[in-house]
């Protein structure tokens, strides 16, 4: 489960909306792949949605919009979980407030579900340390 990054610092915009449209005809429940929405404190699952054809999910993007499909896909090798993701951004008129200039608003934040065996790499700080300089282009690291 994760919450998406909010600010795109390089173009001074803020993501405010996510739209996910699923394109999978005849998706079977036993294949997993259901998207889950979790509460702000990650204490309970609020809802889940099958990735079946024409199912659509629209939600606000903020630091507490916890979502994802955490269970391993078990569909046949010739089947893929297909979706279209659209994001709506607004321009930030002023420079970002100092309290927002924290790393967590510029990266996806991975979160562990309670009472699960979600892997340790889901910890945001450990993940960030592992990938920061190894994989990110230099322009992401400026400022």
Positions of the model-derived regions?
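Histidine-centered divalent metal-coordination motifs
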Residues: 2
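Catalytic core of Fe(II)/2-oxoglutarate
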Residues: 6, 10-15, 28-142
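Eukaryotic charged/polar low-complexity linker/IDR segments
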Residues: 18-20
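Glycine- and acidic-residue-biased ligand/ion/polar-headgroup-sensing regions
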Residues: 23-25
